Amino acid sequence: MLSLLETKIIEPFMVVRQTLAPLRLSRWQIFKHMTRILIFSSNTRTIIFCVLMSLVGYIVSRIIWGRQEKYPDHGLPIVKTNDYHFDNIVAEGKRLYPNQAFMGINKRYKFVIYPSSSWEELKRIPEQTASIMDFQHVCNSGEWSLVGGETHELVKTITAELTRSLPARVPNRQQDAKMTFDTIIGHCPEEKGFNLLMTSLEIIAKINACTFVGRELGANKSWVTAVVYSPLWVYFAVTLCNATPDILRPLLRPLFFLPALRNYWNMQKLLKPKLDREMETFRQTDDKRKLLVPKSDQDLPFTHFLLSRYTEAAATIKQLVIDYIQVSYTSTPTTASALFHALWELAQHPEAAEVMRRELATVMIDGNLPKTHLQELKRMDSFLRESFRLHPITRFTLQRYVKEPFQLSDGSRIPPGVMAVVDAQEINRSPEIWENPDEFDMDRFYRLREISGNDNRYHFVTTSSNSPGWGDGTQACPGRFFATSTLKIVMAHIVMNYDVSLRKVAPLKSQPLVNGSYSPDDSVEIFFKSRNVE
């Protein structure tokens, strides 16, 4: 057996590695070459041998090391279950260790779970010490999915240029919303049913695409389909990886991510002609500042925003493709989840639609929203924040992957490699903070804003210790202003043009996932009926 291993596997690998060394190939490239050799040059006996050796190795590792798991030295109690999610772990941890941090361990991840009292300390920890991007990168196999690999240039572009452009782009985005609904929902003289999850994804993907890649590509069905399925393929791959034994995961991960990679290749093919044109325009323009001014009759110059921040060496077509894929990915599932739950609540509270219609009538002129961040829509803002409070996309907030050790005032020592989070549901459902916390109250935050001195607080987009959905501090969600604007434009179009309803009113069956996030109930059907607008 050892002779077969040496002659069939080890020796060919060493020869190939030495031969290819001058080419400076990556491990992945070497792995692909070895795979071809193994499949096309070896006999069936060798392939079977490799599979058996992998299985034997896994079994032996489980027998010898399976019960010798070591945990970092953090000085915290440990709560471990065989669950694939964290809901039961958090409940047990809070019962055993109320108001203190503990390490929660499920079948895949180890999180240090902090109470909300640690909010201010955690939010001030700098990114070089503990990073939310690295947290997302680790939890979503970022080296394959690209999640969590956003450059600082991309983040700054979203935070600054994109956010500043939003007021002037409101009329354009209203037109994008109308085109999107005409295409996806259409005129519904009678009630027409739609799957709420997939419809929410498609609406947000199409409207956002018109902003980022322009209306021509945004109206391209292939592009919209690729954006819609991008998070679904990543979710599919990550789920399979999480269910795979550790020893086999590196071998099977490329196979699991193949659909996601093919989807990315399709997106790159669609993007390249547009990016080639825009990069050439940027290179040939002497006064590049003129290219950075959004014009109402043109697409948003998002490519030029990015190019103005990158150095010439870093501003490659490859980097821009990655940026566009990342911004399409990150802006779609979270906003679609918020729309999903807002429509679910709207269908159960039809009186809310009439309240929002009256409010819209006071700010709209000839059907047009004002060129602002739409902060005038206080009732709609309160509705969206209340829905976001009851239906977060994840039960955790201030998620951080620790890169450098730190210690908090509670005495917990957090070493590198640990993931730290705060339980957001402790805030969202707290009876000490909210009256009737489990009930939907569309005017909850509107009433709070009406109190003297509170007008700049309790907005949907606000980051604070009682608004955990966006995070807080320097690592708060950079796209929250864009997402809020998108949702208000979409909700305005819906309440002015449609009535929505549910045939079956039942509690949502949101699925808790292994990394603490929630997957919306994909069985909900919602019905649209066009209003008789005079």
From Swiss-Prot:
Q: How does it sit in the membrane?
A: Single-pass membrane protein
Which pathway does UniProt place it in? Answer: Secondary metabolite biosynthesis
Q: Which amino acids does the record list as binding heme?
A: C477
Q: What induces it?
A: Expressed exclusively during fungal penetration of host leaves, the time point at which plant defense reactions are triggered.
The EC number(s) attached to this protein equal: 1.-.-.-
Localization per Swiss-Prot or TrEMBL? Membrane
Major location category of this protein: membrane
Q: Which residues cross the membrane?
A: 46-66
UniProt entry keywords in alphabetical sequence: Glycoprotein, Heme, Iron, Membrane, Metal-binding, Monooxygenase, Oxidoreductase, Transmembrane, Transmembrane helix
Can you cite a GO biological process for this protein?
secondary metabolic process
Q: Name one GO molecular function term.
A: oxidoreductase activity, acting on paired donors, with incorporation or reduction of molecular oxygen
Glycosylation: which residues? N220, N515
Annotated InterPro entries: Cyt_P450, Cyt_P450_E_grp-IV, Cyt_P450_sf
For the protein in the UniProt heading, the enzyme class is oxidoreductase
Question: Record keywords: Transmembrane included?
Answer: yes
Known cofactor(s): heme
Highest taxon in the source lineage: Eukaryota
Q: Which GO terms describe its cellular component?
A: membrane
Which SUPFAM superfamilies does the record match to this protein?
A: Cytochrome P450
Pfam families attached to this UniProt entry? p450
- Family, per entry: Belongs to the cytochrome P450 family.
Function comment: Cytochrome P450 monooxygenase; part of the gene cluster that mediates the biosynthesis of a tyrosine-derived cytochalasan acting as a fungal signal recognized by resistant rice plants and leads to avirulence in Pi33 resistant rice cultivars. The first step in the pathway is catalyzed by the hybrid PKS-NRPS ACE1, assisted by the enoyl reductase RAP1, that are responsible for fusion of the tyrosine precursor and the polyketide backbone.
PANTHER family xref list: CYTOCHROME P450, CYTOCHROME P450 MONOOXYGENASE AN1598-RELATED
Name of the protein described by the UniProt record? Cytochrome P450 monooxygenase CYP4
| Protein's organism | Pyricularia oryzae (strain 70-15 / ATCC MYA-4617 / FGSC 8958)
